[in-house]
């Protein structure tokens, strides 16, 4: 985060929810990232994400001793868009594999998958534990509606599909989990 108003809000929210931030990397330059989410009346969404100073995170800035205390590392595929964070992500994945820390990755956005598919696949040469994506991201990643290829890259895959059931792929098994009906509420 940056030392700006958004950074203060994020840090305060994390503290309020008992999340340790003593090793949070804070930049005195630039802006904290943000995301604009637009929701349509049928509860679909589209996002416009700006990574801000997080796109400059270098592996040398990360306290891996603290990371190694975690059970799981969660990353968004958005980090593939910056040379610094792309390199950091590759090194984190390697270090987590070596330390037996589970790895979860969200494919983030169909445009990210389309533009950086080969890089994302290279990150998962050694299988990650959990892959999260929506139907469009999965189709883009596999170049088809057949998602079994995803098993090459992750042990457990969760594919959301709007109001349709979420598909869960594990080794040789496939499950469907129905979505709960909910009403979209505009909180602005």
Q: Language model features by range: what are they?
A:
Residues 34-38, 46, 165-169:
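Short beta-strand scaffold segments in enzyme catalytic cores
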Residues 59-68, 148-149:
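Short amphipathic alpha-helix with an adjacent loop that forms part of the alpha/beta core around
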Residues 72-148, 164-166:
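Conserved beta-alpha-beta core of the PfkB/ribokinase-like small-molecule kinase fold
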Residues 18, 52-59, 110-115, 141:
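Short gly/ser/thr-rich secondary-structure transition/capping motifs
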Residues 21, 103-104, 157:
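Hydrophobic beta-strand scaffold residues
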Residues 94-95, 143-188:
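Conserved phosphate-binding/catalytic region of the ribokinase-like
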Residues 1-34, 41-42, 51, 64:
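Substrate-binding N-lobe of the ribokinase-like
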Residues 68-69, 126-127, 153:
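Alpha-helix C-terminal capping/helix-to-coil transition sites in glycosyltransferase folds
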